[in-house]
Amino acid sequence: TCGCQMKEVINEYNVVPLPVTMSEQQGRFYLNSDVPIVVNASQEVKHIASGLSTTLLDIAGLKLKPTDELHENVPSIVFDSIPGMEKEAYKLSVTPQLIKITASAPNGFYYGLQTLYQLLPVDVYCKERARNAEWSVPCVEIEDAPTFRYRGAMLDVCRHFASIDYIKKFIDVLAAHKMNTFHWHLTDDQGWRIEIKKYPKLTEIGSQRSETMVDYFYTHYPFKYDGKPHGGFYTQDEIKEVVAYAQSKYITVIPEIELPGHALAAIASYPELSCTPDSTYEVCKLWGVFDQVFCPTDTFFQFMEGVMDEVVELFPSSYIHIGGDECPKYAWEHCSHCQKLIRELGLENDITPNPVDGRKHTKEEKLQSYIVSRVEKYLNSKGRNIIGWDEILEGGLAPNATVMSWRGVEGGMTAAKAGHDAIMTPNPYAYLDHYQEEPEIAPVTIGGYNTLKKTYSYNPVPADADSLVKQHIIGVQANCWAEYMPTEDNRDYQIFPRLIAISETGWTPMKKKNFTSFCNRMVEDFQRLEAMGVKPCLNFFDVNINTRATQEGVLNVELETFYPGAQIYYTTHGEQPSIHANLYNHPFPLDGTYDLKAAAFVNGKQIGKVTHKQLYKNLISGKKYEIMPEPKGMKGDILGENDILGADTVTLGLTNGKRGNNASSTPWVGISPDNNDKVTFIVDFEKATIRKIRFGTLYNAAGGILPVS
């Protein structure tokens, strides 16, 4: 077979995302070329059913035959349309004599078929003929429908370009996991990736950058570059091809055209779109946020309307994403045209907080709201609505806008309370460019630390949300920003398996979600991903090493693997772990300096790589402390201050037995002293005798991180 064979499947009902109800039954349905497919539904559903016939012919060599009549005592597959079900809902019944998918709309039939595929041998996802597979389905009764109507994933192709083949593979995985939206980030400072025939320079100039910065943003100062041109764009024919491909899998493609910030690629192509049109610009070759933004002149609005005219012809989505994030106001503050426009519009700095978000907004923030509202009005005239990142709340929200909440959950909550739809994509959970395993051993990325477990734990609707908020939080999305993903393998590693966790959050009722169950089902889903050509992060099979303090101040070492039923063996003095090493049963106290190595084993065989961590015991290990001024942002707990390990977790970034490193700033405690004055650290040593105090600091001048003197 072509699927991954190194891991043992836990059970036969490994459906991801988990259905609303699933009742396992006795027996199996056996497939052979005598099995007919009966479709009592529309021509579109017949086309869906033909996909099953084609797949089984190509992969299994089975020639299932379509027919219009169901005959008694003949094992059959039936697609049966009934009225009254939700658009994406379906029922799947499997008995020894009958496989029956019931739905009201083609979307439901398609999702029922995806569940059926997941109950078949994993070989059904292969690209070539399977060998030695038993083509049968375990008997089951399933009733299913999604929790949220919007279940999306965003792919950034501006920082690093992605091929059409990769885009299609990405869509395949979304569809297999019942996600229904592909958010395509097509324009940014580092590249313009969509052909606009009215403005050819956007791709002649804007799609190419001369070189790209290397390593992490703050590693080198001055910055270093690779000296290699990077570029690419999608022709309108290619975009039509992708949109049609996605539609065949019941996925809507939403394009993102960034404005008014993240505009350098467009400004490099047409400098007259900026506040300083006589300046010379280039497509950006480093990462970050830049002052060069669109200037709200008649020229800009004519340009954007021309761009949107072509965009709406290419994308039938009811939504167009207009970005709206990270737009510095410096250029507008120093632009005579912008200041004149601000006066003409009567925009002023707020004296009292805005009633919607409780903030005082500047006149320049209100100018951004004017720009967004004007573009929205134009798109509304074309029958489209806009989505924007949560910054579009600042200065006033456009009348019909949907907010995509990325800087935490507050933006989405604010929008929902104001009666606007919101899509939740908070970076502490849903940003797939963040680390998912220890930064020391992982490929360099932007920062953060979102484990599979943490990503899975997210609930888009807070437990105390009122009915208005519940009504307007319409879904969830995973975001994949590609600054540190120069290859498609890098993308796969960052995206998977965490995207699958987001798929379950979007589909499965929160009360049904269970991380242990998810991990059981993920063992086979890793095989599906491999069969589909995906190369995911395999931290799932490794051991995570954590420390946690008890309320009594004892610092315990905790070892965890996501692989269900695996045994963890460890050593404390640098030896390679084996089944003859220490078997981990429960947390143990850190009572010395440990050169800890651990690995997971199943049936006596190691399944992942060895995890290595040095831990240190000293007089303040596990002790609580106070820091003044209070740390903001970086608090030293790599798992996050609201860690899912439990409410009794004590955040002890400075006394957790771990040393910081240069791989990431996340494990460090970051402090901004008032007036560049002193930092006060208070800890109770109790009765200990102190002979020496040592501390370490992170020094990174390029990042504005300075050592303590």
Predicted segments, located by residue:
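Active-site beta-loop-alpha junctions enriched in small/polar residues
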Residues: 158, 187-191, 258-262, 325-329, ...
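Flexible, acidic glycine-rich loops studded with aromatic residues
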Residues: 386-401, 405-556
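Short, compositionally stereotyped local motifs that mark structural "simplifiers"
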Residues: 6, 17, 21, 38-40, ...
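Active-site neighborhood of glycoside hydrolase catalytic domains
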Residues: 266-271, 283-285, 290-399, 406-414
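Contiguous, structured surface segment used for ligand recognition
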Residues: 2-148, 490, 505-528, 532
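Aromatic, loop-rich ligand-recognition surfaces of beta-strand-rich domains
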Residues: 659-709
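Feature activates predominantly on carbohydrate-active enzymes
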Residues: 85-319, 335, 374, 378, ...
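Residues within well-ordered beta-strands of beta-sheet-rich folds
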Residues: 102, 154, 185, 252, ...
